[in-house]
């Protein structure tokens, strides 16, 4: 999701402290057979755990670490410009909680097991009412590239998207020039569907993006044989 749905310049909410959900809520998430979004996740995202990675709700206290991780040139070059201050990330985190409560968006902090520092994010936004179709994206501190953190985190997010949000089609975009991002998407089973010409503006120029998609049926067909790491919801 190189075009992040958050627009800092359009966020006029000033009362960050009252808008933030500062208490982490975990709960049982029930998978439904129809494409109706469970209401549970809107009150607070569950903690998703793997062998090395835990994904949880963003908190105001994550602002400083996200600022350090996501504003470096190598991380930020292929995503919408991230906030440029710690305060800007606090505003972004407050916005993610409002959008989650509205039932249109979910954003997880990426942490390592045994450590609570946020080292990146995974996000999902609906592109069709009720999450029939959605778009997902990610940003991870460069120190954790090539370590398996993305792979495990992506598996957790995809499971959440298809089993909890009941997504039918999950899309992603990556700039053609973003070799690492394209490789990461292919590695988790995303299928390239085309190229969106000059669809993303960055640093004063328009870039072509590759459009990827994962369908629910395809994901269910391959997950049991290709994903070996155990993962679960923490209740």
Spans of model-derived segments:
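Acyl-donor (CoA/ACP) binding surface of acyl/acetyltransferases
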Residues: 2-74, 107, 111-235
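Hydrophobic residues in alpha-helical segments
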Residues: 70, 79, 100-101
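Conserved GNAT-fold acetyl-CoA-binding loop/helix
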Residues: 74-95, 106-108
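A generic secondary-structure signal
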Residues: 95-99, 160
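Short loop/turn motifs at secondary-structure junctions and domain boundaries
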Residues: 98-103, 190
């Amino acid at each position: 999701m190189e075009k992040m749905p958050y627009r800092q310049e359009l966020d006029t909410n000033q009362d960050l402290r009252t808008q933030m959900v500062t208490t982490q809520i975990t709960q049982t998430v029930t998978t439904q057979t129809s494409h109706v979004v469970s209401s549970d996740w809107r009150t607070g995202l569950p903690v998703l755990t793997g062998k090395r990675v835990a994904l949880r709700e963003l908190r105001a206290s994550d602002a400083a670490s996200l600022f350090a991780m996501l504003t470096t040139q190598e991380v930020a070059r292929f995503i919408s410009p991230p906030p440029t201050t710690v305060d800007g990330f606090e505003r972004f985190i407050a916005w993610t909680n409002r959008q989650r409560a509205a039932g249109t968006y979910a954003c997880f902090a990426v942490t390592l097991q045994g450590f609570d520092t946020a080292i990146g994010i995974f996000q999902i936004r609906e592109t069709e009412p009720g999450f029939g179709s959605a778009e997902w994206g990610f940003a991870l501190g460069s120190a954790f590239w090539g370590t398996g953190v993305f792979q495990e985190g992506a598996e957790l997010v995809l499971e959440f998207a298809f089993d909890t949000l009941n997504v039918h089609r999950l899309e992603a975009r990556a700039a053609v020039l973003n070799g690492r991002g394209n490789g990461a998407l292919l590695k988790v089973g995303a299928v390239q569907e085309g190229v969106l010409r000059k669809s993303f503006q960055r640093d004063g120029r328009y870039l072509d993006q590759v459009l990827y998609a994962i369908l629910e049926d395809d994901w269910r067909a391959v997950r049991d044989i290709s994903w070996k790491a155990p993962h679960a919801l923490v209740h």
